[in-house]
């Protein structure tokens, strides 16, 4: 039996499909999306970013239980989403200050959990870069930061989705073989830390614990893990988390993310869905940049739709309801916030 306050429960239900699985689309990218559109189009314009997000939301949210957006460029997309699609809202500033050690997080100054809720948000999402092996003086700042967010979300009774992105302060190339060998331990450490009740996290938005580019049978070159080792890392991460968790696509291709989810399904990992971003819509940027709105709309109605609906089928086969970590749906006791 677990007690969940009504606001958090209602938010989680609005973000989930009829099976309790979070089949969500992510397009809260800001700086990176702006650069991608600028490269494809040759010009920089805030409206281009807004329009791209709006078209993605309009065309793809009929196939998603929820969408993750920002309020900087995403307001038109929020209004354009399908009526049955829930809304997660980003609270953190994009990127980090590269002149300061530790990739420290920061919040959007004119936003709060209350304002996110007032704007129709069903959950607050925070991304934090995390290296469990960095000095305590850096990580304690991040811990206190997340404790404050958790308290704020509890106060206004809205779900808190935390996205810890792991890194190594010394191995700076996150796509390297060297980092691939470190990644499983980093992801496990982030799960152990941020599952603690002090943070008030409701759902963990996790990286998969391996880089599939280096998994035997998937790798084209060097190998960091056998398939059995990769499976063990998936299973250990699943067992470590007392909280519901979903996977993020982390900028990989649609094909690679589908293979990743198939792998999780084959090994009975207890994940409760995905927040899939670039894997779904990134190939549409070039179409938008070179051919405009109508061409992007057509791409979204064909390839974009195929990307998301084929992923939905995989979730249908393997994802478990968000309440599975607590037992059955009947084991979730909904209480009014005091």
Curated annotation (Swiss-Prot):
**Pathway(s) served:** Carbohydrate metabolism; D-tagatose 6-phosphate degradation; D-glyceraldehyde 3-phosphate and glycerone phosphate from D-tagatose 6-phosphate: step 2/2
Keyword entries, A-Z: Lactose metabolism, Lyase
Matches recorded under InterPro entries: Aldolase_TIM, DeoC/FbaB/LacD_aldolase, LacD_aldolase, Tag_1.6-dipho_adolase
Does Ribosomal protein count among this protein's keywords? no
Instruction: Give the top-level enzyme category.
Output: lyase
- Which EC numbers characterise this protein's activity in its record? 4.1.2.40
Keyword set includes Lyase: yes
**Which molecular function terms from Gene Ontology are attached?**
6-deoxy-6-sulfofructose-1-phosphate aldolase activity; tagatose-6-phosphate kinase activity; tagatose-bisphosphate aldolase activity
Any one of the GO BP annotations: D-tagatose 6-phosphate catabolic process
Catalysis: reaction(s): D-tagatofuranose 1,6-bisphosphate = D-glyceraldehyde 3-phosphate + dihydroxyacetone phosphate
Could you say which protein family the record assigns here?
Belongs to the aldolase LacD family.
> What protein name is recorded for this chain?
Tagatose 1,6-diphosphate aldolase
Could you tell me which species this protein originates from?
Listeria monocytogenes serotype 4a (strain HCC23)
Which lineage ranks, top first, belong to the organism behind this chain? Answer: Bacteria, Bacillati, Bacillota, Bacilli, Bacillales
């Amino acid at each position: 039996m677990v007690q969940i306050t009504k606001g958090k429960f209602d938010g989680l239900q609005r973000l989930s499909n009829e099976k309790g699985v979070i089949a969500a689309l992510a397009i809260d990218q800001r700086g990176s999306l702006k650069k991608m559109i600028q490269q494809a189009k040759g010009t920089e314009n805030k409206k281009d970013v807004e329009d791209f997000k709006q078209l993605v939301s309009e065309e793809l949210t009929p196939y998603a239980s929820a969408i993750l957006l920002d309020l900087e460029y995403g307001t038109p997309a929020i209004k354009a989403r399908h009526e049955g699609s829930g809304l997660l809202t980003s609270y953190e500033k994009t990127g980090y200050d590269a002149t300061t050690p530790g990739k420290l997080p920061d919040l959007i100054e004119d936003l709060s959990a209350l304002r996110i809720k007032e704007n129709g948000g069903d959950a607050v999402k925070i991304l934090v870069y995390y290296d469990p092996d960095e000095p305590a003086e850096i990580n304690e700042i991040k811990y206190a930061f997340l404790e404050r967010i958790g308290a704020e979300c509890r106060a206004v009774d809205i779900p808190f989705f935390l996205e810890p992105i792991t890194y190594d302060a010394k191995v700076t190339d996150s796509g390297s073989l060297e980092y691939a060998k470190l990644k499983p331990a980093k992801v496990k450490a982030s799960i152990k830390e941020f599952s603690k009740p002090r943070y008030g996290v409701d759902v963990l938005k996790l990286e998969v614990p391996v880089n599939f580019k280096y998994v035997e049978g998937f790798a084209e070159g060097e190998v960091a893990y056998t398939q059995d080792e990769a499976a063990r890392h998936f299973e250990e991460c699943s067992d470590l988390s007392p909280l519901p968790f979903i996977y993020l696509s982390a900028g990989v291709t649609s094909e690679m993310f589908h293979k990743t989810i198939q792998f999780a399904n084959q090994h009975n990992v207890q994940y409760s869905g995905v927040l899939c971003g670039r894997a779904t819509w990134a190939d549409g940027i070039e179409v938008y940049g070179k051919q405009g709105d109508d061409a992007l709309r057509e791409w979204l109605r064909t390839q974009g739709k195929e990307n998301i609906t084929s992923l939905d089928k995989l979730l249908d086969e393997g994802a478990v309801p968000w309440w599975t970590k607590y037992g059955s749906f009947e084991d979730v006791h909904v209480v009014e916030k005091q």
